[in-house]
Design a protein with these regions (language model features):
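A conserved mid-protein helix/loop that constitutes part of the nucleotide-sugar donor-binding site
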Residues: 1-8
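Nucleotide-activated donor-binding/catalytic signature segment of Leloir-type glycosyltransferases, i.e.
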Residues: 10-22, 27-59
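Short loop/turn segments at beta->alpha junctions
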Residues: 25, 45-46, 78, 117, ...
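Nucleotide-sugar-dependent
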Residues: 48-52, 60-86, 92-104
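Conserved acidic donor-binding segment of nucleotide-sugar-dependent glycosyltransferases
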Residues: 79, 97, 110-119, 127-133
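Conserved donor-nucleotide binding/catalytic region of nucleotide-linked donor-dependent transferases
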Residues: 103, 126-144, 169-173
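A charged, aromatic-enriched C-terminal amphipathic alpha-helix characteristic of glycosyltransferases
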Residues: 116-119, 132-164
Length: 177
């Protein structure tokens, strides 16, 4: 959907192709990407190269399926790649239905440009890709969210504190019984 929408945009300042990177070797996954309009399938890159590719990109795209069966499977999950994108990436564009944890999380925190309806895709892509100030604001929000919720130094302390509170509460309840 995204590649097709991009390929139909007629703004010379907007890229009309998406570079897709994946290490998958599954023919059923790769072949449709290679044939899709607006998609340049680049294959696999090293983990070290990911940050460099992200740094040289206008945006990073996170997608979730609109198919009901897939929506049920991912309803409560948030990809670890999202945290990476928030911390190191350019503007994150999220495309998927509301009611999916990752889409809702990004939207509630203004940490991505969220397009949650297929009928809004082309217009939304044009808006975010032509508005540098909006992309920069989203990146600022994303960095702040990453520091708050996805920080390797802070999160273990948060978990320990939470576990200690649970233990303390349990001990207090047991001592009063």
């Amino acid at each position: 959907d995204i590649g097709k929408a991009l390929s139909e945009l007629r703004d010379e300042n907007v890229p009309n192709v998406i570079d897709v990177y994946s290490g998958t070797r599954e023919f059923d996954c790769i072949e449709p990407l290679k044939k899709a309009p607006g998609i340049n399938f680049c294959g696999e890159i090293s983990a070290e190269s990911v940050l460099e590719v992200m740094a040289n990109s206008m945006a990073v795209i996170h997608t979730e399926s609109f198919e009901q069966e897939m929506m049920e499977l991912v309803r409560f999950s948030v990809s670890t790649k999202i945290a990476e994108s928030l911390m190191y990436g350019p503007c994150l564009i999220a495309y998927g239905p509301e009611g999916i944890a990752s889409i809702d999380y990004l939207k509630e925190n203004n940490a991505a440009y969220v397009i949650s309806r297929p009928e809004d895709l082309e217009k939304g892509l044009e808006e975010i890709l032509t508005n540098k100030e909006l992309r920069e604001q989203i990146v600022r929000n994303a960095r702040a969210l990453a520091l708050k919720n996805h920080n390797a130094d802070v999160n273990p302390r948060k978990v320990r504190k939470w576990l200690q509170e649970v233990v303390d509460k349990s001990q207090n309840e047991n001592s009063t019984n």
